[in-house]
UniProtKB/Swiss-Prot annotation:
Gene source species: Lawsonia intracellularis (strain PHE/MN1-00)
Entry's EC annotation: 6.1.1.22
Chief location: cytoplasm
Subcellular location: Cytoplasm
Protein known as: Asparagine--tRNA ligase
UniProt cross-references to HAMAP family, sorted A to Z: Asn_tRNA_synth
Any one annotated GO CC term: cytoplasm
Pfam families: tRNA-synt_2 (PF00152), tRNA_anti-codon (PF01336)
InterPro entries xref list: Aa-tRNA-synt_II, aa-tRNA-synth_II, aa-tRNA-synth_II/BPL/LPL, Asn-tRNA-ligase, Asp/Asn-tRNA-synth_IIb, NA-bd_OB-fold, NA-bd_OB_tRNA
One GO process term, biological-process aspect: asparaginyl-tRNA aminoacylation
Keywords in alphabetical order: Aminoacyl-tRNA synthetase, ATP-binding, Cytoplasm, Ligase, Nucleotide-binding, Protein biosynthesis
Molecular function terms from GO: asparagine-tRNA ligase activity; ATP binding; nucleic acid binding
Subunit: Homodimer.
Keyword Transcription regulation in annotation: no
């Protein structure tokens, strides 16, 4: 039988004569005639105190049991006289699954730097900070699925291997075939064309939206950008909804509503974890998250955003001009100094956006939108898609891209075209927003970045 989780045990209303809990030892304290073990199983931030009395069957199993060891304990759940805890376990029996020699176990009872913990990513989840981060990550993912399910979206799966470049940026990982482990020769003959890891599931999601109405994909994406920044990783997760019969306003509404729903859910279900991060990682985190959901997001056209930036007379590293793609410093000024709130920028110049975005009537801008949030910058990027065949063909030619490569995408406009819209949400950036963490490497269980491919 599976053990009870500590979060379940701590929610008990009454004492129990027979409990079974498994976990990893955080601390061991010896006293005359008994031993205190602080046990954590990852189900919550809190530990459960386990008391082993001399003479019990469990006492004989204590040899070598220290911080890092994994055990199962069996005994009685009783009220605790200690401060800050309602319950403790009087242990009658203990099974030792694995020891951790203190002279080599890297996680001792002290603060470790994030840089050090990245080198032991396989163990860092056992710390309070990273346990909290990855519980919040899991809750955020579940909240996203629940939100879309309630909204009538279908969860779909799009290819990881692709022959097309959704973004047209060319920063893709090539996939080739090696005929044996010792073969230095590679081949593109498997598919008969070049194959890459996907940068986005958007184009395929559009196809399914044209028959299912509202869909979303939630999966890994890959960018071969040689960017060693706290905001970029080579492998990350994207949430990409697509909606038939939707325009730019619908898209902006969905982006705002989804973001707020996830924040509310995490604040509701993981307040202990958030409080820890508020104290040790990002002071003021709880207040910042509450402020985000307290009032509607600002909406500002690209033209107005550039005007605001020009009027600031700030000495930006990247000078502000119309036609500029907003940089991190511009996003930071808009969200943290000017609006002091999330802002959705819309109607961008077509020259700085992708081919599939719908051209506005002014023929100079497209119906694109970016959701910018304080401390993170761009969280979501999306658009109303170009549903008019002639306009889409013209734009593809204008950018010098291959019409033949997108024959299937163009078919959506030939056969029953419909206005539709969607966006991509960078899931790791959302987790950074929720946790106060400043480096994307610390919200990915096993980060993939330039020059680093451990685990």
């Amino acid at each position: 039988m599976l053990p009870s989780t500590i979060v379940e045990i701590l929610c008990s209303k009454t004492a129990q004569a027979d409990v079974h809990v498994g976990g990893w030892i955080r601390t061991r304290r010896n006293a005359k005639g008994f031993v205190f073990l602080e046990l954590n199983d990852g189900s919550c931030l809190k530990n459960i105190q386990c008391i082993i009395n001399e003479g019990s069957a469990a006492w004989d199993m204590l040899d070598g049991v220290n911080t890092g060891a994994c055990v199962s304990v069996y005994g009685k759940l009783v009220p605790s006289p200690g401060r800050g805890q309602d319950w403790e376990i009087q242990v009658e029996k203990m099974v030792v699954h694995g020891l951790a020699a203190p002279e080599v176990f890297p996680l001792q009872k002290k603060r470790h730097s994030d840089e050090f913990l990245r080198t032991i990513a396989h163990l860092r989840v056992r710390t309070n900070k990273y346990g909290a981060i990855f519980r919040i990550r899991a809750e955020a993912a579940q909240a996203i699925h629940n939100y879309f399910y309630k909204k009538g979206f279908y969860y779909i799966h799009t290819p990881i291997l692709t022959g097309s470049d959704c973004e047209g940026a060319g920063e893709m990982f090539r996939v080739t075939t090696a005929h044996s482990s010792n073969d230095s020769q590679s081949s593109d003959n498997f598919f008969g064309k070049e194959c890459s890891l996907t940068v986005s599931g958007q184009l395929e999601a559009e196809c399914l939206a044209m028959g299912l109405g509202k869909v979303y994909t939630f999966g890994p994406t890959f960018r071969a950008e040689n960017s060693n920044t706290p905001r970029h990783a080579a492998e990350f997760w994207m949430v990409e909804p697509e909606m038939a019969f939707a325009d730019l306003q619908d898209n902006m509404n969905l982006a705002e509503e989804l973001t707020c729903e996830v924040i509310r859910k995490v604040l509701q279900c993981h307040i202990d974890d958030i409080m820890l991060l508020d104290k040790y990682v990002q002071p003021g985190l709880i207040k910042a998250l509450e402020n985000i959901i307290a009032k509607p997001f600002i909406r500002c056209s690209y033209h107005d955003a550039i005007t605001i930036l020009l009027s600031s007379h700030k000495d930006f590293e990247f000078p502000v001009t119309f036609g500029l793609d907003l940089q991190s410093e511009h996003e930071k000024y808009l969200t943290e100094e000017y609006f002091k709130h999330p802002v959705i920028i819309f109607d961008y110049p077509k020259e700085i956006k992708a081919f599939y975005m719908r051209q506005n009537d002014d023929e100079e801008t497209v119906a694109a939108m970016d959701l910018l949030v304080p401390r993170i910058g761009e969280l979501i990027g999306g658009s109303q898609r170009e549903e008019r065949l002639d306009n889409l063909l013209s734009r593809i030619r204008e950018l010098g891209q291959s019409i033949e490569e997108y024959w299937w995408y163009l078919d959506l406009r030939r056969f029953g075209t419909v206005p539709h819209a969607g966006f991509g949400l960078g899931f790791e950036r959302l987790v950074m927003l929720l946790t106060g963490v400043s480096n994307i490497r610390d919200v990915l269980p096993f980060p993939r970045t330039p020059g680093y491919l451990e685990f």
